[in-house]
Amino acid sequence: MFKGILLVSLGAVPGAWLRFRLINHFEPLIPAKHWGTFAVNISASFLLGLLVGLNQTCPSTPLLLLLATGFLGSFSTFSTFIVELLVLLHRQAKAAALMLAIASLVGGLFAVEFGLLIGGLA
């Protein structure tokens, strides 16, 4: 149990740090802040698909705890995505909210599928 908690914790710190850095990197480049979160979530979807695919050929629970649960769990953020959607809706930016929701869902599905393909599961 302690080993699992330690692995998740060791992965979570760099995942959260990288998310912070990437979102702040995208912010000056793209006027709408929600696209930084989008980029992080799509890349996390790809990486999770890749890990799941690779884990099928070379199973490793400690690696999944460190990278999937710890790193990617703190790197991507569904709750921020939902808040950003609600902010757009409250601003009456319904088209932008719909575009973000569809792009996130479709992009996430394709990213996971691509990760699974590269990881050898698909």
Model-derived regions, located:
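Membrane-interface helix-loop junctions in multi-pass transporters/channels
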Residues: M1-A122
